[in-house]
Amino acid sequence: MSCPYAGNSNEHDDAAVPLSNDVGKIYGEYLMLDKLLDAQCMLSMEDKRPVHDEHLFIITHQAYELWFKQIIFEFDSIRDMLDAEVIDETKTLEIVKRLNRVVLILKLLVDQVPILETMTPLDFMDFRKYLAPASGFQSLQFRLIENKLGVLTEQRVKYNQKYSDVFGNDERALNAIRSSEDNPSLLELVQRWLERTPGLEADGFNFWEKFQHSVDQFLAAQVHSALLEPVEQAKNYRLMDIEKRREVYRSIFDPALHEALVKRGDRRFSHGALQGAIMITFYRDEPRFSQPHQLLTLLMDIDSLITKWRYNHVIMVQRMIGSQQLGTGGSSGYQYLRSTLSDRYKVFLDLFNLSTFLIPREAIPPLDESIRQKLIH
């Protein structure tokens, strides 16, 4: 039976490349499949004791590394676009598109873990001895992703030594690590971009002053309502809760308190960047802030998916080797991996915590005509 979607030969453009036996060769050459498909060297086979699941292990990790390369490629292009004083809406749209691509890739990587879990612990044990001293900790590309995203060296969990020491005397790897540490990370560039959010200017709309005033009014209304509470215990509880909220707001309104939290590692953004992020969150329905809000949401998605990938990896490792054995690279294995699930590895932590500082929609300072005109132009 012929293909129902194929037209007859008379319908084809004379300039079209004819199908022939050379098509497969061209395809293979373009993708360099001879190298790609010949890169699965099973050490168990070299030892004349082939283990079937070692092939799956190699393929899965090679697929990870290929996708890591694409993520780095996208991050580098996004960083180039963000590294400018003015970012027009066309570039913002492109940044959003590429961040969304990274999100979809990471979802794919998270979903790859269950494929590895089709291998039983006993299957893994059959070839694990061939892996040492190799370790996932030695994935240069994953370290570059972390650095380009904005994971700080001081935030990293110690792994017997500095994370770059595992690359030994590999100058290419060490130079790549140093370059990723020295160049502006996505976090730094997003921070600069947020600091330039229109409407933050003290001599303009001055969102921050208006926001503080709205918070004061909101808390005053809460206190007034609490004082009308007839049950003394309930009243005291509500007043205590309001005071706690007041302290939370004070941590963003007092620059010194904010800076102390940054130094302690509890916050990442500068004070100005935090103001910009809050303003974009409040006015995300305004056309000018729609794309920036999408951008911030995608950054959170990336952080979340990397955390999910780490978590899935941790659970898989525990299933394969338990929680007491050392990793093949000499790390504490499960214990080390579990420690990377903390907020210290969450680059855009401040975006996740923005909901802490929300106020009711009706209390959000309305945009005046001057700022609306500025946002349009």
UniProtKB/Swiss-Prot annotation:
Describe the reaction catalysed, as an equation: L-tryptophan + O2 = N-formyl-L-kynurenine
- Tell me any Pfam family this protein matches: Trp_dioxygenase
Q: In which pathway does it act?
A: Amino-acid degradation; L-tryptophan degradation via kynurenine pathway; L-kynurenine from L-tryptophan: step 1/2; Pigment biosynthesis; ommochrome biosynthesis
Which positions does UniProt annotate for heme binding?
313
Its domain of life reads Eukaryota
Q: How is the cofactor bound?
A: Binds 1 heme group per subunit.
User: What is its cofactor?
Assistant: heme
E.C. numbers? 1.13.11.11
Q: Which InterPro entries match?
A: Trp/Indoleamine_2_3_dOase-like (IPR037217), Trp_2_3_dOase (IPR004981)
SUPFAM superfamilies annotated for this entry? Indolic compounds 2,3-dioxygenase-like
Q: Which GO terms describe its molecular function?
A: heme binding; metal ion binding; tryptophan 2,3-dioxygenase activity
Q: Does the keyword Heme apply?
A: yes
GO BP, sorted A to Z:
L-tryptophan catabolic process to acetyl-CoA; L-tryptophan catabolic process to kynurenine; ommochrome biosynthetic process
Positions contributing to substrate binding: 57-61, 128, 328
For this UniProt record, the keywords arranged alphabetically read as follows:
Dioxygenase, Heme, Iron, Metal-binding, Oxidoreductase, Tryptophan catabolism
| The protein's role, per its UniProt record | Heme-dependent dioxygenase that catalyzes the oxidative cleavage of the L-tryptophan (L-Trp) pyrrole ring and converts L-tryptophan to N-formyl-L-kynurenine. Catalyzes the oxidative cleavage of the indole moiety.
Q: How does it assemble?
A: Homotetramer. Dimer of dimers.
Family (UniProt): Belongs to the tryptophan 2,3-dioxygenase family.
What is the designated name of this protein?
Answer: Tryptophan 2,3-dioxygenase
